[in-house]
Amino acid sequence: MLTLRKSADRGFADHGWLKSHHSFSFAGYYDPAHMGWGNLRVINEDRIAPGTGFGTHGHRDMEIISYVLQGELAHKDTLGNVVGIPPGDVQRMSAGSGVRHSEFNHAPAETTHFLQIWIEPDVTGIAPSYEQKTFAAADKRGRLQLVASPGGAEGAVTIHADARVYVGLFDGAESATLALAEGRKAYVHLVRGQIRANGQPMQAGDALLLDGECRIDLTAGRDAEVLVFDLAP
């Protein structure tokens, strides 16, 4: 089964300092048909205005991944991490038994544009932890680079969930195929540009939901940046 969901069908919230598109039900946006996909619970595409951000707030029992597309995200948490997250970095925070953090855009003029992703963990109540890694554009060019996985396979950040997250950059004749094990779900989110996923034309912000498929084929990219999720059913 293939289901294409257009960018304009996502939830949207404009808080002035924050503009956010919600792929799944989140905060004031509720759609019972879009509560998540497999163990993928949240994809928020956020744009934070200069000099603003999320004040200190808490999370529990969630694998939280941030992927910055433009600008820099300043992160501070109760684990003692005070870091900047630039474009191309993948940040993973396992909330576990509880963690508090803030996220700000300290730039005087540039908007911070990033994706915040939540994946439900396999186990609850674990000790919270933090990890951040850089993935160069060359590693993602014309292929799917694994950036988050159980056990941190292939240099990815480690998540405590039965899920694998890939990022790829595609243009022209570049293409990639990802095999899916029987019974898996998958989710393709196009960050920018254009691409075809299993023959379906996609524009920036579109998503393709897969259930019962044996592979993902990515072709015909035009300045495309794409995230692919291999998920527990």
Language-model region placement:
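Jelly-roll (double-stranded beta-helix
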Residues: 1-233
